[in-house]
From Swiss-Prot:
Belongs to the RNA polymerase beta' chain family. RpoC1 subfamily. Pfam families: RNA_pol_Rpb1_1, RNA_pol_Rpb1_2, RNA_pol_Rpb1_3. DNA-dependent RNA polymerase catalyzes the transcription of DNA into RNA using the four ribonucleoside triphosphates as substrates. Mg(2+) binds at residues 467, 469, 471. Its EC number is 2.7.7.6. Binds 1 Mg(2+) ion per subunit. Binds 1 Zn(2+) ion per subunit. The keyword Oxidoreductase does not apply. It is an enzyme of class 2 (transferase). This is DNA-directed RNA polymerase subunit gamma. It comes from Synechocystis sp. (strain ATCC 27184 / PCC 6803 / Kazusa). InterPro entries: DNA-dir_RpoC1_gamma, DNA-dir_RpoC_beta_prime, RNA_pol_asu, RNA_pol_N, RNA_pol_Rpb1_1, RNA_pol_Rpb1_3, RNA_pol_Rpb1_3_sf, RNA_pol_Rpb1_clamp_domain.
Length: 626
């Protein structure tokens, strides 16, 4: 089998499609020379045979076979007939997956305007035509005529709007025996708009606008600049203004608007099929009316209905009454499928699930370092499975991948020590949606934890705008060495202390951290349990607190031989001196008691503090290692 070469491209550009381009999307020449692509019938499938109707919205001749390597009539089956076009049904024998990308088209009996360009904000049709949006709508929806050529009539101007009565009056004057009026042309509907757009010489209009901009100011200048910008964009993209009206409508592949049979024999179908059916029905009816030379008022009404059907297909509800289906539910148009949070871009393209990633609720991990995160064992073994398998084979515990997977599935105790080894020094990235700035995704060193929640250091919460009331975070594993290096050097949490927006520290204790520090170090005169007791050292005092002999805020005395004691206020003033009779002296300060020898050396020093302050000081000292 020949390897397919990947098409290389530099960028994707979105531009207005010409009618020829739309026709090219859907039109194909079969190997036998038959040209197919135009959808002419509104039928979907035959409800007796359950096969797609020919030339309908699910036609196998246009879009490809419903079953792999099988034509519509069943004459050709199996892959050996690849590429053959059936003489009976005209279906090319190929894979059914072509129905996911082969398009069709509908040739319209009359042009229609594209609702995005008419009713969008701003309305590009009204900007290009230099007319009010209300006036353009009047023309498009057959409520007013527009003068396409004033001829020799002095009372008419180019692009002037006329009501039905005014046009009837002018017609009477034109067809009068003594009339001298010549060359007057008026139009209505999208055909008139298409002609007005086609008559625009974009380069000439752009030059004229540049001259006018130089001579004008204020609101008029802003309006001219807006029009020039639109025209310049048309020129730059080699697009023509009349392409904003449609002569041909693309029909998207049938597998993207499926029809499936339910248990009760009923069918569930995509809303697009109903919208396409409306367009085809009205288009066929209009073509038939034009053939039989029906009265102009009937043809005009059918053209308006066709315009409304195409509007509903492209963007249902943008203009006029919303088309509804069963249970008065608005039908989902092409725009509804593309736009919004559940649309194709945000949901399916940007919101794809990626390999080597997981998601779980976050809980606080107070014992973690700032650059660490607690990763549940269950999640870690899944994320790091390839690395664990490689390590198991390298250590000779298993011989192949299958045996390694079996060992992991069984939950063998050996795998946990291997997992510990694998994750050491391998950072993971944590991301919390919405990622509004670069600190919304940071790297951490994983620590294996029990349970099913990711543990996060409380100090990194402001960067993620996270809290622990049920927030979820995603974990991603950088696979290549380059990615791991970048994660460690650039994205590690301890390297992201400053806010990129303000340059101020974003890592700052808040809420319960500040409250905890305050509570530990606060003074409470009412705490009398064990107050005034003496302890030989810090450990003794903490042991007494653990056994409930002293309160957290009780004032106690601790022997502390280090001279360097920091107090809230300078404590250098001796309040009282007591001679102990053995040549030593006891000096009493506000928060200290010092026993000095004959030569003034410190024998013993007691300082007044609380168990809470001891805990705080000890924790800080251990963290800073001084």
């Amino acid at each position: 089998m020949k390897a397919q070469s990947e098409p290389r491209f530099d960028y994707v550009k979105i531009a207005i499609a010409s009618p020829e381009r739309i026709r090219q999307w859907g039109e194909r020449t079969l190997p036998n020379g038959t040209v197919v692509g135009e959808v002419t019938k509104p039928e979907t499938i035959n409800y007796r045979t359950l096969k797609p109707e020919m030339d309908g919205l699910f036609c196998e001749k246009i879009f490809g076979p419903s079953k792999d390597w099988e034509c519509w009539c069943g004459k050709y089956k199996r892959v050996r007939h690849r590429g053959i076009v059936c003489e009976r049904c005209g279906v090319e024998v190929t894979e059914s997956r072509v129905r996911r990308h082969r398009m069709g088209y509908i040739k319209l009996a009359a042009p229609v305007t594209h609702v995005w360009y008419l009713k969008g904000i701003p309305s590009y049709l009204s900007i290009l035509l230099d007319m009010a949006l209300r006036d353009v709508e009047q023309i498009v929806y057959f409520n007013a005529y527009v003068v396409l050529n004033p001829g020799n009539a002095s009372n008419l101007q180019y692009k002037q709007l006329l009501t039905e009565d005014q046009w009837v009056e002018i017609e009477d004057q034109i067809y009068a025996e003594d009339s001298e009026l010549e060359g007057i042309e008026v139009g209505i509907g999208a055909e008139a708009v298409q002609r007005l757009l086609a008559e625009l010489q974009l380069e000439e209009v752009a030059e004229k606008l540049r001259e006018e901009i130089l001579a004008s100011k204020g609101q008029k200048r802003a309006k001219l600049i807006k029009r020039l910008r639109v025209i310049d964009n048309f020129i730059a993209t080699h697009s023509q203004a009349e392409w904003m009206t449609l002569d041909v409508i693309p029909v998207i592949p049938p597998d993207l608007r499926p029809m499936v049979q339910l248990d009760g024999g009923r069918f569930a179908t995509s809303d697009l099929n109903d919208l396409y059916r409306r367009v085809i029905n009205r288009n066929n009816r209009l073509a038939r009316l034009q053939e039989i030379l029906a009265p102009e008022i009937i043809v005009r009404n059918e053209k308006r209905m066709l315009q409304e059907a195409v509007d509903a297909l492209i963007d249902n509800g943008r203009r006029g009454r919303t088309v509804v289906g069963a249970n008065n539910r608005a039908l989902k148009s092409l725009s509804d499928i593309i736009e919004g949070k559940q649309g194709r871009f945000r949901q399916n393209l940007l919101g794809k699930r990626v390999d080597y990633s997981g998601r779980s609720v976050i809980v606080v991990g107070p014992n973690l370092k700032i650059y660490q995160c607690g990763l549940p064992r269950e999640m870690a073994i899944e994320l790091f499975q390839p690395f664990v398998i490689h390590r198991l084979i390298k250590l000779g515990i298993v011989n192949n991948i299958k045996a390694a997977k079996k060992l992991i599935l069984k939950g063998d105790p050996q795998i946990w020590s291997v997992l510990e080894e694998v994750i050491t020094g391998h950072p993971v990235m944590l991301n919390r949606a919405p990622t509004l700035h670069r600190l919304g995704i940071q790297a951490f060193e994983p620590i294996l934890v029990e349970g099913r929640a990711i543990q996060l250091h409380p100090l990194v919460c402001p960067a993620f705008n996270a809290d622990f009331d049920g927030d979820q975070m995603a974990v991603h594993v950088p696979l290549s060495l380059e990615a791991q290096c970048e994660a460690r050097l650039l994205m590690l949490a301890c390297h992201n202390v400053l806010s990129p927006a303000t340059g101020k520290p974003i890592v700052a204790p808040s809420q319960d951290m500040v409250l905890g520090c305050y509570y530990l170090t606060a003074e409470n005169p009412n705490a009398q349990k064990g107050a005034g007791r003496y302890f030989a050292g810090i450990e003794d005092a903490l042991r007494a607190y653990d056994h409930g002999q002293v309160d957290l805020h009780s004032q106690i005395w601790i022997r502390h031989l280090d001279e360097d004691v920091v107090t809230e206020k300078p404590d250098t003033e001796v309040i009282k001196t007591e001679d102990l009779g053995d040549g030593t002296v006891m000096k009493y300060y506000r928060e200290r008691k010092i026993r000095e020898g004959v030569d003034g050396e410190i024998i013993t020093q007691y300082i007044q503090t609380t168990p809470g302050r001891i805990i705080y000081n000890k924790t800080i000292a251990e963290a800073l290692v001084f």
